Swiss-Prot record:
<dbReference type="GO" id="GO:0160112">
    <property type="term" value="C:axonemal B tubule inner sheath"/>
</dbReference>
<dbReference type="InterPro" id="IPR043597">
    <property type="entry name" value="TPH_dom"/>
</dbReference>
<keyword id="KW-0225">Disease variant</keyword>
<protein>
    <recommendedName>
        <fullName>Cilia- and flagella-associated protein 45</fullName>
    </recommendedName>
</protein>
<dbReference type="GO" id="GO:0016208">
    <property type="term" value="F:AMP binding"/>
</dbReference>
<dbReference type="GO" id="GO:0061966">
    <property type="term" value="P:establishment of left/right asymmetry"/>
</dbReference>
<dbReference type="GO" id="GO:0005930">
    <property type="term" value="C:axoneme"/>
</dbReference>
<feature type="coiled-coil region">
    <location>
        <begin position="157"/>
        <end position="526"/>
    </location>
</feature>
<dbReference type="InterPro" id="IPR033253">
    <property type="entry name" value="CFAP45"/>
</dbReference>
<keyword id="KW-0175">Coiled coil</keyword>
<dbReference type="GO" id="GO:0030317">
    <property type="term" value="P:flagellated sperm motility"/>
</dbReference>
<keyword id="KW-0282">Flagellum</keyword>
<comment type="similarity">
    <text>Belongs to the CFAP45 family.</text>
</comment>
<feature type="region of interest" description="Disordered">
    <location>
        <begin position="461"/>
        <end position="489"/>
    </location>
</feature>
<dbReference type="GO" id="GO:0060287">
    <property type="term" value="P:epithelial cilium movement involved in determination of left/right asymmetry"/>
</dbReference>
<keyword id="KW-0966">Cell projection</keyword>
<feature type="region of interest" description="Disordered">
    <location>
        <begin position="1"/>
        <end position="30"/>
    </location>
</feature>
Length: 551
């Protein structure tokens, strides 16, 4: 619609009044929720713009065309304003002289108008539902497109020919995946137990080999000890023989010396008489010499005896040292065996404690799961009972309210009928007094009362039907909720059954994978060259490992 001159004038007057009232403006609130686009673009204070724009529901181009069509852009239009004291000629401006007016488009005005509308709760819920449905539809479309693109990508990846580098990368990725799966499977309790069994078999094999090696070394040491004892005994016998030979030679020398002395004495016996003194002297010298020889012999015998004692002491010391070394070696071996036995006992005790702890944790988990399931089933049964009890209570409340209202209506009806009867009696008395005059009036009154009664009865019937419909809808809603709860419970049980079946299948597959890995480990153990008896013992222990229970 074209903009009228009166509209422009009224807008200018309103702007002038607002400018005059600016000084009397008081702040009502610190913050405001008014659309800022109503105030136009933010301008600097230097431009002299006020904060009271005039809103014209036309854009600049439409306004310019309108003014051009009216001819206002060529010749200014004047308006004569007559007041009580003067007459003025006012020029209608073609532009906003103050520069404070805001010109917005109809679309912007409609947007501001729509934004200022306060939505009700139903409208907000409807808008939220529409937004939620739109979002779900968008997400479904996105997921569908993603699935289609993923399928196309899988088909393209399966059909395309890989390059050498991609083949190497693919093979490396598969190897890494297999290694990761293998490492993940190694963390299973059965495989850990299998690794412990294999390690235990290796330890037993190493320990038996060490024991055999110790026995061999001990046997060699005993043989060497016997050989050294024999050598020392032979050396001792030789030393004794040499000592006896030396004693024999010395005795022979003494005997030969004595014989020579006797021969010399016999030879010089003839000269004794002549050389008595000389002989006596010689005899004395000879006796001294004999004594000296005897002393030397005694000293020599004592020295040889001391050497013999020293040699025996040395031999005893060597024997004692050998016995001491033997005792120390036996003590070390015994200590090593005790340490090995203590380590084995402690290890077995730790393993027993660990297995007992694992068994206790498993039993506690089973008890907790059973308790949670019992609580869940009890809560579901309790919720269903509460829903049924709540529905029954609501139904009883509704029935009591209906009976109360029925009694109230019956009481009112009886009161009304009593009043009617009383009124009728009065009317009959009045009719008897002035029957001719009041016949038509009584008939009209009777018809009015009868019509009111019928309307009241119809109204009560409609209200009763409405209440019955409401009760029926409420009962149907309760039954629907009970059915939904029962269906949810059935679905939960089906889901629980499916979950148990899936867990059982996964446990079976896991059991097969673990058995395959056990067989491979036993084959690798045999491939290491371990004796067959240890392999058989490890296989026997691996076959009696307990399987993981699935709840």
């Amino acid at each position: 619609m074209p903009l009228s001159t009166a509209g422009i004038l009224s807008s200018s007057s309103a702007a002038s009044n607002r400018s005059r009232n600016k000084a009397r403006y008081r702040t009502k609130a610190v913050s405001s929720e008014v659309d800022e686009s109503l105030f136009g673009d933010i301008k600097s204070p230097a431009q002299g713009q006020s904060d009271s724009p005039i809103v014209l529901l036309r854009d600049k181009h439409t306004l310019q065309k309108t003014l051009t069509a009216l001819g206002l852009d060529r010749k200014p239009e004047t308006i004569q304003l007559i007041t009580r004291d003067m007459v003025r000629e006012l020029i209608v401006p073609t532009e906003d002289p103050s520069g404070e007016s805001l010109i917005i488009s109809p679309e912007e005005f409609e947007r501001i108008k729509w934004a200022s509308h306060v939505l009700t709760r139903e409208e907000l819920e409807a808008r939220d539902q529409a937004f939620k449905k739109e979002k779900e539809a968008t997400m479904d479309a996105v997921m569908t497109r993603k699935k289609i693109m993923k399928q196309k990508e899988m088909v393209w990846n399966n059909n395309k020919k890989l390059s050498d580098l991609e083949e190497v990368a693919k093979e490396r990725a598969q190897n890494l995946l297999q290694r990761a799966n293998k490492l993940r499977m190694e963390q299973e309790e059965e495989l850990k137990d299998m690794s412990k069994i294999i390690l235990n078999a290796k330890c037993h094999a190493i320990r038996d080999a060490q024991i055999l090696e110790k026995q061999q070394i001990q046997k060699e040491l005993d043989t060497e000890e016997k050989r050294l004892d024999q050598m020392m005994e032979v050396e001792r016998q030789k030393s004794i023989q040499r000592q006896e030979e030396l004693e024999r030679k010395r005795r022979e020398e003494r005997i030969r010396g004595r014989r020579q002395i006797v021969e010399q004495m016999e030879k010089n016996q003839e000269e004794r008489s002549l050389l008595a003194e000389q002989r006596e002297q010689e005899k004395e010298q000879m006796l001294e010499y004999m004594e000296q020889l005897q002393e030397e012999d005694l000293k020599d015998m004592e020295r040889r005896q001391q050497q013999k004692l020293k040699m025996q002491a040395e031999i005893k010391r060597i024997n004692d040292e050998n016995q001491k070394q033997k005792a120390e070696l036996l003590a070390q071996e015994k200590l090593a065996d005790q340490m090995v036995m203590e380590f084995t006992k402690k290890k077995m005790a730790r393993e027993a404690e660990f297995e007992a702890e694992q068994e206790r944790i498993r039993r506690e988990k089973e008890k907790e799961i059973a308790r949670l399931r019992a609580m869940q089933e009890k809560a579901q049964d309790y919720q269903a009972e509460q829903d049924a009890l709540r529905a029954k209570r609501n139904q009883e409340v509704a029935d009591r309210e209906w009976r109360r209202k029925e009694k109230e209506n019956a009481r009112k009806k009886m009161e009304t009928e009593a009043e009617l009867r009383k009124s009728r009696l009065e009317q009959v008395a009045f009719k008897e007094h002035a029957l001719a005059v009041q016949v038509q009036r009584d008939r009209d009154e009777f018809e009015r009362i009868l019509r009111a009664q019928r309307e009241q009865i119809e109204k009560e019937r409609l209200e009763e039907e409405k209440k019955a419909t409401g009760r029926l809808q409420h009962a149907n809603e309760l039954r629907r909720q009970v059915r939904e709860n029962q269906q949810k419970e059935v679905q939960n049980r089906i889901a629980t059954f499916e979950e148990g079946r899936r867990l059982k299948e996964e446990a079976q597959k896991r059991r097969e994978r673990i058995d395959e890995i056990k067989r491979k480990k036993l084959e690798e153990l045999r491939a290491t060259g371990l004796p067959e008896k240890y392999c058989i013992e490890a296989e026997r222990k691996a076959n009696i490992l307990p399987a993981t229970s699935v709840n």
